[in-house]
Curated annotation (Swiss-Prot):
This is UvrABC system protein B. Residues 453-606 form the Helicase C-terminal domain. Pfam families: Helicase_C, ResIII, UVR, UvrB, UvrB_inter. GO terms for molecular function: ATP binding; ATP hydrolysis activity; DNA binding; excinuclease ABC activity. It comes from Mycobacterium tuberculosis (strain ATCC 25618 / H37Rv). Residues 635-654 are annotated as: Disordered. Keywords: ATP-binding, Cytoplasm, DNA damage, DNA excision, DNA repair, Excision nuclease, Nucleotide-binding, SOS response. SMART domains: DEXDc, HELICc. The UvrABC repair system catalyzes the recognition and processing of DNA lesions. A damage recognition complex composed of 2 UvrA and 2 UvrB subunits scans DNA for abnormalities. Upon binding of the UvrA(2)B(2) complex to a putative damaged site, the DNA wraps around one UvrB monomer. DNA wrap is dependent on ATP binding by UvrB and probably causes local melting of the DNA helix, facilitating insertion of UvrB beta-hairpin between the DNA strands. Then UvrB probes one DNA strand for the presence of a lesion. ATP binds at residues 62-69. The keyword Transcription regulation does not apply. SUPFAM superfamilies: C-terminal UvrC-binding domain of UvrB (SSF46600), P-loop containing nucleoside triphosphate hydrolases (SSF52540).
Length: 719
């Protein structure tokens, strides 16, 4: 039976057109060598009971390492409903996506985060008369994953999307996205030239030389496309104006992967509109422009009026000619046909109305959701006031908390330390999950004096490194983390520094390298907390634990302590000269859970087992097409090469495929890495001159990865 008919708790949206969207059925099925254990069976049963009883909000208080992700997968299997899982940052979203993908291999588990590696928003500083133009660097792989998420949501029901707070930002309406998609069937009459025009209308570009994502090429009666959301290319073979065959094929080798009878090509951008809607939008923009110009001129703001007239007229002309312009999202209100002040369409509107929302690390994620709107609107008001944007640009924004709450149905909050909002929604009730399936208990907490703390820390690090274990060190400031990293390097310790400027996929890669043993110590500030799943870490060192504040609150300390809870010999060392209230609360809660876990183990004869977790991440999915690529002159895949993949039979030695056969770039000095980039650039240009474009593309990918490595070294102050 459909959930909507049994329980009226559904998500509402003025943009959702469910009756127009026919999604393929699909059955969620968990594939796992393990059955629920510890507190998991009781927690899954209780969550299912509460949700089926129609409770709108449910809290799962799950201690670190108790398998909240696995519990979520089993709950999804029980409920059989499309699910949005929200995580507080990209790193945790990547980790969650990978875990759910492993447990739900036959279903669509998608990843939806901001696609910017670098983003400088458009802004105007009135005090200094400084206009800052929007500048950004888009990660092509992450953009593909975003398109993959929206196309899956409009095509099937067995979908889980793992997203960051990016999911509450404006996106094109699902109806426009669907209406502008192109459905193709074998035997159907479709004029070839008409299809090419349709593809151009939805922002695909024709490129017969360089075949990349979001482009198509034409060879006689054959059209080949790489959709914006696919790793594979699509081949359409015509006989006259009739579609004779449809294939999925490898974009580089041309090898046919499978033949299909029908398929749908979704647009290359989420901001699309048909000719009629675009014409209507242009008229509305011109009307608003005239009103705003009259308003500015009546106030004597002639400079602002002229600036707005030039910028907007240019954008209008671009939209008329090519159906798109830079910054088109600022006109989304007109393109969507919305009224002033109304919220934009977001990823939430792509879900069916009976979807389930799971908020991971809710004590962090919930406040994030509520804070996005104010930061965005203050910047936009300045742009509008000084003639850089029309007032309607303010309606290209994230949702407010009230709008978000109105668009969601039933919600499960996951956290080891639930916040006040979640508990208030459930009247203080929660489902508890503190017993780990592996029998692991919470780590022992040791408080040490700050005098001689660095020497003590170095001794502890060396002990752990000798036992092939890892260490996390958390500091209060970026400067302290940088200085500590430099000092540890001077002392001959293999250490890296994780900070907010490291781009999305590189951040995941650093954590993966820590688990692989490429280095022993990871120093961070606020990134070494919620959800980081690192079983090899046996020691977490908290410097300045007695400095009260956001980073040393009881919730923060409990989360940080949890990073050592996945190792049999896990310990937490707090360096402090006094025990604060927050420290006492965190230590007491850890001891309470530890006592309960030990009692359960003794009663059931359980011997704690070390967690053996496969070392994999979202990178495996992002780059897996490289493994299927035919070996050209350089051999192997460039993108995997710079990541130092391990050779079979040599688990301790990181080696590279491709251009760097036998060389470990992660251990290269900075100067050598810079020389290598220069050398590869010359080889890339030579390959391009010789028309060896596939080889040149390999070099390009290598260079991009190495430059990211170089930026990371510069940021960490490595030589």
């Amino acid at each position: 039976m459909a959930f909507a008919t049994e329980h009226p708790v559904v998500a509402h949206s003025e943009y959702r057109a469910v009756e127009e969207i026919v999604r393929a059925g699909g059955h969620f099925e968990v594939v796992s060598p393990h059955a629920p254990a510890g507190d998991q069976p009781a927690a899954i049963d209780e969550l299912e009971r509460r949700i089926n009883a129609g409770e709108r909000d449910v809290v799962l208080l799950g201690a670190t390492g108790t398998g909240k992700s696995a519990t979520t997968a089993w709950l999804i299997e029980r409920l059989q409903r499309p699910t949005l899982v929200m995580a507080p940052n990209k790193t945790l979203a990547a980790q969650l996506a990978n875990e759910l993908r492993e447990m739900l291999p036959h279903n669509a588990v998608e990843y939806f985060v901001s696609y910017y590696d670098y983003y400088q928003p458009e802004a105007y500083i009135a005090q200094t008369d400084t206009y800052i133009e929007k500048d950004s660097s888009i990660n092509d792989d992450v953009e593909r994953l975003r398109h993959s998420a929206t196309s899956a949501l409009l095509s099937r029901r067995d979908v889980v999307v793992v997203a960051s707070v990016s999911c509450i930002y404006g996106l094109g309406t699902p109806q426009s996205y669907l209406d502008r998609s192109v459905e193709l069937k074998v035997g159907e009459e479709v004029p070839r030239d008409g299809l090419l025009r349709l593809l151009v209308d939805v922002q695909y570009t024709r490129n017969d030389m360089s075949f990349t994502r979001g482009s198509f090429r034409v060879r006689g009666d054959t059209v080949e496309i790489i959709p914006s959301y696919e790793e594979l290319a699509v081949r359409i073979e015509f006989f006259g104006d009739e579609i004779e065959a449809l294939y999925y094929l490898h974009p580089l080798t041309g090898e046919v992967i499978r033949q299909v009878d029908s398929l749908r090509i979704f647009p290359a951008t989420h901001y699309v509109a048909g000719p009629e809607r675009m014409a209507h939008a242009v008229s509305a923009i011109e009307e608003e422009l005239a009103e705003r110009l009259a308003e500015l001129e009546s106030q004597g703001k002639l400079l602002e009026a002229q600036r707005l007239r030039m910028r907007t007229n240019y954008d209008i002309e671009m939209m008329r000619q090519v159906g798109f312009c830079s910054g088109i999202e600022n006109y989304s209100r007109h393109i969507d046909g919305r009224g002033p002040g109304t919220p934009p369409a977001t990823l939430l509107d792509y879900f069916p109305e009976d979807f389930l929302l799971v908020i991971d690390e809710s004590h962090v994620t919930v406040p994030q959701i509520g804070g996005m709107y104010e930061g965005d609107i203050s910047r936009k008001r300045n742009l509008v006031e000084y003639g850089f944007r029309l007032p309607s640009a303010c309606d290209n924004r994230p949702l407010t908390w009230e709008e978000f709450a109105d668009r969601i149905g039933q919600t499960v909050y996951l956290s080891a330390t639930p916040g006040p909002y979640e508990l208030s929604q459930t009247g203080g009730e929660f489902v508890e999950q503190v017993i780990r399936p592996t029998g692991l208990v919470d780590p022992k907490v040791v408080v040490k004096p700050t005098k001689g703390q660095i020497d003590d820390l170095i001794g502890e690090i060396r002990t752990r490194a000798d036992a092939d274990q890892r260490v996390l060190v958390t500091t209060l400031t970026k400067k302290m983390a940088e200085d500590l990293t430099d000092y540890l390097l001077e002392m001959g310790i293999r250490v890296r520094y994780l900070h907010s400027e490291v781009d999305t996929l590189r951040r995941v890669e650093l954590l993966r390298q820590l688990r692989l043993g490429d280095y022993d110590v990871l120093v961070g500030i606020n990134l070494l907390r919620e959800g980081l799943d690192l079983p090899e870490v046996s020691l977490v060192a908290i410097l300045d634990a007695d400095k009260e504040g956001f980073l040393r609150s009881s919730r923060s300390l409990i989360q940080t302590i949890g990073r050592a809870a996945r190792n049999v010999s896990g310990e937490v060392h707090m360096y402090a000269d006094k025990i604060t209230d927050s420290m006492r609360e965190a230590i007491d809660e850890t001891e309470r859970r530890r006592a309960k876990q030990i009692a359960y183990n003794e009663a059931n004869g359980i011997d704690p087992q070390p967690l053996r977790k496969k070392i994999a991440d979202i990178l495996d999915q992002v780059y897996r097409e490289a493994d299927d690529t035919a070996v050209v002159e350089v051999g192997g895949s460039g993108r995997n090469a710079s990541r130092g993949r391990r050779a079979q039979g040599e688990p301790g030695r990181a080696v590279s495929a491709g251009v760097f056969e036998g060389r470990d770039t992660s251990a290269m000095p900075r100067a050598e890495l810079a020389d290598l980039i220069k050398d590869l650039t010359a080889q890339m240009m030579a390959a391009a001159r010789d028309l060896q474009f596939e080889l040149a593309a390999r070099f390009r990918d290598e260079i991009a990865d190495l430059k990211r490595e170089l930026r990371g070294m510069d940021a960490a102050g490595l030589k």
